[in-house]
Amino acid sequence: MKFVDEASILVVAGDGGNGCVSFRREKYIPKGGPDGGDGGDGGDVWMEADENLNTLIDYRFEKSFRAERGQNGASRDCTGKRGKDVTIKVPVGTRVIDQGTGETMGDMTKHGQRLLVAKGGWHGLGNTRFKSSVNRTPRQKTNGTPGDKRELLLELMLLADVGMLGMPNAGKSTFIRAVSAAKPKVADYPFTTLVPSLGVVRMDNEKSFVVADIPGLIEGAAEGAGLGIRFLKHLERCRVLLHLIDIDPIDGTDPVENARIIISELEKYSQDLATKPRWLVFNKIDLLDKVEAEEKAKAIAEALGWEDKYYLISAASGLGVKDLCWDVMTFIIENPVVQAEEAKQPEKVEFMWDDYHRQQLEEIAEEDDEDWDDDWDEDDEEGVEFIYKR
């Protein structure tokens, strides 16, 4: 299936149902009084994370999701039925962004996690709600409020422990093939990898980690050169980055300059990503003899001002790969993921307020108090129906 990691959709919650103006008419009950029921609340729109999905391709074709409107109230104090909710299932790792405000509404990081993205409208009040000691035959009601409407950007971000960085043809895909069962395409030309891929590295029956391979970066990627830097977002949740450097590039480029290009593009994309733990890994040492490879790696590290440990491996032959993987496993065990607090669901939507109905009733009561001595007829059935809007 085609890998799609971005999609824009429209979500519209249901409007609230209107209240009803009605009076009880029954034999032998001359003054039945008001019996208009309230409307039903509008349906909500929810996001739900599903671990069985791995792409957003479905939302390239289906872009609009609308919840059901609440039914209007009816006579005999019948309340309208609440509108049905709509649930949109997305892959685990999806970030939901409100395109109107640029606000991140939530990150779907766990299977079954739900996120409210559009709140349904409040129900309107029937005329029964407006009955008082001075207004026995109210002809007032309120309409339901509109449901929330948002344009959302969905961004799928892979969940991995380790991320691979490097220029095209640095050997990232060869490495992930060597340490996991993943089989990304490998060839001797740049940009063989076009989409991110995941591989599970199993060290033993109880220890494993997930590694993410993304397309290579080149100079100017931040400005859109090559495949750009859009895939770097898949590394944001990684705990450590493996920066693969081709120790002896076949195209004759300078490994030091290549490494600096990667660092520069990281900083242009995100300072947070640039400050993540990053390990220097020199690949393709099988092309040189051992002493020459060690001397060249040391010279490159010094030129980069690298003072931490670095690794020499050959992904093709497996030389040094196992030791690197065990060190990564140890790092992951010693640095467990700090569970971020789940984003709190907003209890209100901007145009909603919890005391909406209370305010409506207070306003009607004030008007009734002002007009308490006006002439009015309880049996007048031809009066005007009042609709209060907010």
UniProtKB/Swiss-Prot annotation:
GO cellular component, one term: cytosol
Outcome of substituting residue 80 to E: Temperature-sensitive for growth at 42 degrees Celsius, defects in chromosome partitioning
Residue span(s) of domain G: 162-284
InterPro entries the record matches: G_OBG, GTP-bd, GTP-bd_Obg/CgtA, GTP1-OBG_CS, GTP1_OBG_dom, GTP1_OBG_dom_sf, OBG_GTPase, P-loop_NTPase
Molecular function, one GO term: GDP binding
EC number: 3.6.5.-
One annotated GO biological process: chromosome segregation
Protein name: GTPase ObgE/CgtA
Organism: Escherichia coli (strain K12)
